[in-house]
């Protein structure tokens, strides 16, 4: 069976992302696949490329031919160099590092969540205290009315 490693389109109009799949070369672009070996999302900055290296190595080893876009992705991740035994097997894939801005946003969100939790618990405590006060106020007139009724009789 002639197998290819190619992209399977998903997503919506003007916002496509792809799955890297192994498929029989005679099947449709988005048809039944043999195995999914990765994800490619060109819409993020930098583009998201996740390829299972061991599965890509296996399929390249048994003769699967990558399409041109997948060939470029395999070069970026370093899987093609690893398969061919070339230098640069670490790849040139860029990753997004969590900078101080991201850490500050995370801290702000956690702080906001703690404030909301504290406000919610205070509101619950106030509501409970008001309910107890209202219950005590209702019981007091009822007791006075009960005491006055037998006195008149």
From Swiss-Prot:
Biased composition (Acidic residues): 140-153
Region of interest (Disordered), residue spans: 130-153
Gene3D superfamilies on file: 3.30.1320.10
GO molecular function: structural constituent of ribosome
Top-level taxon of origin: Bacteria
GO CC term, one of those recorded: cytoplasm
Keyword field contains NADP: no
Keywords tagged on the record: Ribonucleoprotein, Ribosomal protein
Cystines in this chain: none
Keyword Ribonucleoprotein attributed: yes
Single GO BP term: translation
Pfam families: Ribosomal_S16
Sequence similarity: Belongs to the bacterial ribosomal protein bS16 family.
Record's protein name: Small ribosomal subunit protein bS16
Protein's organism: Bifidobacterium longum subsp. infantis (strain ATCC 15697 / DSM 20088 / JCM 1222 / NCTC 11817 / S12)
């Amino acid at each position: 069976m002639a197998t290819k490693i190619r992209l399977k389109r998903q997503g919506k109009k003007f916002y496509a992302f792809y799955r890297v799949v192994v498929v029989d070369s005679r099947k449709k672009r988005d048809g039944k696949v043999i195995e999914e070996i990765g994800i490619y999302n060109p819409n993020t900055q930098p583009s998201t490329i996740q390829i299972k290296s061991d599965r890509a190595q296996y399929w390249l080893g048994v003769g699967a031919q990558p399409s041109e876009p997948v060939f470029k992705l395999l070069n970026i991740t370093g899987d093609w160099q690893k398969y061919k035994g070339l230098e640069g097997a670490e790849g040139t894939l860029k990753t997004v590092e969590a900078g101080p801005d991201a850490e500050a946003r995370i801290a702000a969100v956690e702080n906001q969540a703690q404030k909301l939790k504290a406000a919610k618990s205070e509101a619950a405590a106030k509501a409970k205290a008001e309910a107890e006060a209202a219950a005590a106020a209702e019981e007091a007139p009822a007791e006075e009315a009960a005491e006055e009724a037998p006195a008149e009789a």
